[in-house]
Amino acid sequence: MTEKKYIVALDQGTTSSRAVVMDHDANIISVSQREFEQIYPKPGWVEHDPMEIWATQSSTLVEVLAKADISSDQIAAIGITNQRETTIVWEKETGKPIYNAIVWQCRRTAEICEHLKRDGMEEYIRNNTGLVIDPYFSGTKVKWILDHVEGSRERAKRGELLFGTVDTWLIWKMTQGRVHVTDYTNASRTMLFNIHTLDWDDKMLEVLDIPREMLPEVRRSSEVYGQTNIGGKGGTRIPISGIAGDQQAALFGQLCVKEGMAKNTYGTGCFMLMNTGEKAVKSENGLLTTIACGPTGEVNYALEGAVFMAGASIQWLRDEMKLINDAYDSEYFATKVQNTNGVYVVPAFTGLGAPYWDPYARGAIFGLTRGVNANHIIRATLESIAYQTRDVLEAMQADSGIRLHALRVDGGAVANNFLMQFQSDILGTRVERPEVREVTALGAAYLAGLAVGFWQNLDELQEKAVIEREFRPGIETTERNYRYAGWKKAVKRAMAWEEHDE
């Protein structure tokens, strides 16, 4: 029998599908990536073609093995991590989607959300699903498809249609329609799942008129769900044995599996999650309560806060403001000045996320004087990412009563040393940047590997988690508080800027 030397992680993201091969020491052996089309049928609407998601993801899987010259019988298991909330409904018989995937960013269900608020559902939804009422989550998207595709609700009741988030869709395709499952982390983002009873919530299904028959079975994040045959050399059947939504996978990949450990992912936006162990902490500060993975992939809970504009504000400096040619230049220009000369940039281009949740806030630059130049504005834009992260962390500490000792970081913007140092300064906390930057794929690989005994336990993985650089606070508390107070003042003035129709 061929030795099982590798784990494959499939990382199905918002703009691309990736496959990553890892060895027993968690080294990345090979990566393959394919982008796919973003479909914008109307302003504020975002769709993907589910068949293209499948085509790009399945081809990266074949490609990544060919690239590394690995045969499929050397693969111990496959783990899947995915863009969360994105919603697909397909025919059980043919495997054909009845509509495009409605993406997490899509705002088309705002009206359904307004109805839920008017019907007084906010408290129920917060208490039982851990979420706020927002078009972001899957529940209202499923309702929209059933409302708009003729005859679909009746077909769903007859068991002819299936719903799934992207993980569920991929596993259905990989197992030729034999397995219809999701995991607790993805289920917790649907607004249809009771995070306390760990079952689909009958009241939510009733309110949104979604037949239970179309929902997947919900399982742990680390167990064998089914087998797939990916052909290639060997043509062996490989267990699919790990699933987690992208942010929860990153939390696990950073080994934040104990209560009070937190990570922040700096991508287009920032996603910060803090593990709260076995207790679901209800937020009084605008955060979400969500399910995360404990040390063996069992259910833990986490608080989550999302910042809408992180890397996106650096892209704005580059593409719209033309102040930099490349995102990497931002660090160089930011360090050409000692400070921002009193300038604050509030990048509320699409409103503000946690903990403010103000869709009517708009971007602003405050504190301009004649002495302000482009470098000050670049620096202030980078600093805004760190300030927004502190906003979320303060909310987490208030909700959980846990004081954070270190923040683990990942995502594209963590390569910026200026930003990471300022993040540590403004939090007054250590910031730890890992050697392996692919922590989302790493999380999926860990979950899959633990389920099949490729790794025995997390202790084995702890040794492999190398911190490449640690940033420590370099400013005094008074200075930190003074700067943060300026930020709070700026945010206050940017809020409620857009008129909203009463």
UniProtKB/Swiss-Prot annotation:
InterPro entries: ATPase_NBD, Carb_kinase_FGGY, Carb_kinase_FGGY_CS, FGGY_C, FGGY_N, Glycerol_kin
Catalytic activity: glycerol + ATP = sn-glycerol 3-phosphate + ADP + H(+)
Pathway: Polyol metabolism; glycerol degradation via glycerol kinase pathway; sn-glycerol 3-phosphate from glycerol: step 1/1
Description of how activity is regulated: Activity of this regulatory enzyme is affected by several metabolites. Allosterically and non-competitively inhibited by fructose 1,6-bisphosphate (FBP) and unphosphorylated phosphocarrier protein EIIA-Glc (III-Glc), an integral component of the bacterial phosphotransferase (PTS) system.
PROSITE patterns: FGGY_KINASES_1 (PS00933), FGGY_KINASES_2 (PS00445)
EC number: 2.7.1.30
Alphabetized Pfam families for the sequence: FGGY_C, FGGY_N
Subunit and partners: Homotetramer and homodimer (in equilibrium). Heterodimer with EIIA-Glc. Binds 1 zinc ion per glycerol kinase EIIA-Glc dimer. The zinc ion is important for dimerization.
Name under which the protein is recorded: Glycerol kinase
Biological source species: Escherichia fergusonii (strain ATCC 35469 / DSM 13698 / CCUG 18766 / IAM 14443 / JCM 21226 / LMG 7866 / NBRC 102419 / NCTC 12128 / CDC 0568-73)
